[in-house]
Amino acid sequence: MQPLELYIHIPFCVKKCAYCDFLSGPAGEKEKEEYVKMLVDEIRNCPDTVQNYRVISIFFGGGTPSLLTGEQIGRLMDTVREIFTLDEDAEITMEMNPGTVTEEKLRKYRQAGVNRLSIGLQSVNDEELRLLGRIHTYEEFREAYHLARANGFSNINVDLISAIPGQTVESWRRTLEQVMALSPEHISAYSLILEEGTTFYKKYVEDEAKEGPKLPDEDAERQMYWDTETLMEKNGYHRYEISNYAKEGYACRHNLGYWERIPYLGFGIGAASLVPGDLIGKCRKLEGKMSRYTNPDQLSEYAHSYRNKFQAELLTETEEMEEFMFLGLRKMNGISKKEFSEYFGKSLEDIYGEPICKLESLKLLEQDDDRVWLTKRGIDVSNSVFVEFLLEE
C-alpha cells in the first residue's frame, strides 16, 4: 500500500495574531460543532480508492485545533479510522495554543490517538508576545508544556519566531536557551514574514511604523539566524530543514512527507490536497502525474462543495519538476537524482544541468553521484536559489 498523509484544518482561534495570515478566526461553540460535523461528512465522502493507501501521518492545523474538545477530536479520529487504513505507528500531530490547554483536553487527545503536540510559543519575552497578539504569557506556556509531559506526551515541538518588532539579538538568544533548557524533541524557528492583509503588514509596510517598536535591522536579523543554527547544534538539535531542528529520531514525519511530495489529502476550509490520479479515480494524462485541489476558503462555499473535492486540476510535468526541486532542496540532505529520473523518466542533468552548474560555481549548491543539496551559503539565500529552477512552459 502506498503512503498517504492527512491534513485537517481547524480554522478557529481566540483572536487573530498580528502576524497571522492563516485562514482562521473566532467562533462560538455551535459553529465549532457544526464545522466538526462537516469535516466528518467530508472524510466519509472520500472515494473507495483511498483503501489502496495507508495513512502514515495526520496533522491537525489551524487556527487553534486545541479549541476543540477531546470528544470532537475523538470523533474525527474515529471517522478517519472508519474510512482509512491507519498505520499503527502513524504520527498524529495537533497544533496547540498554550492559552487553551487543560488537563482534560490533553488526556482525551491522547485517548483519541494524538501522539505529538506542536505548541506555539514564539517568544519567552512577555512584551514580545503582547506585540505579536498572543493570548498567553511565557509562564502559561511553561505550565502547558509541563502538563503535556505529565499526561504522557513524549514528542513535542515548540514554534518560535525571530525578528519580532523590538526584539534584540540578546532577547532571541534567551528565547532559544530557555526553550532548549526544557528539552522539547523538536523546535521550529521561523523568521517573521510580513504577510499582506495582517496587522503587522499594515503597520510596518503600509504605514511604515512611525511609532512603537521597530523591526530589527538586517544585520540583527542575520545574526539571529546564525545564532539559531549555532545554539541548536550545540545543544543536540539537528537541522534537517531550513527552519526545523530535531533531536535524533524526532524529525516531523508529516513535514518530511510534504517536502518529499508524498500524497496528502486536506480536509476543511482552505485545505489543500496533492493526490495521484488513481486515488481520484481518473485516468492520468501524459503530462503530470499528480493533481492538486484546494477547498474553498469561505465556510458557506465549503459546505456545498466538498462533495466534489476530487474534481482536481492536473499538474503539468513542468509544475511537478519545479515543486520537486523547491520542496526537496529545503531539506538539508537535498534531492535524489535517482528519484528524479525514476519519477520523471528524465535525468536531472538533462533538465537542470545548467542552473546546477551555475549555483555550484557560486558555492550555493553541492552535489555527489546521487544527491544535490544547498550549502550553508545557499541556505542563507534559498529563495534566490529556488528561482533558478523555474522552467519555461
Identify the meaning behind each predicted range.
Residues 360-370:
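A short, conserved structural fragment
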Residues 2-10:
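Immediate flanking context of iron-sulfur cluster ligation sites
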Residues 346-358:
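Short amphipathic alpha-helical interaction segments
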Residues 371-375:
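Minor-groove-contacting beta-hairpin "wing" of winged helix-turn-helix DNA-binding domains
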Residues 11-22:
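Local cysteine-cluster metal-coordination motifs and their immediate loop/turn environment
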Residues 377-393:
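Short, amphipathic alpha-helical interaction segments positioned at domain boundaries
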Residues 3, 24-46, 53-346:
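C-terminal scaffold of the Radical SAM
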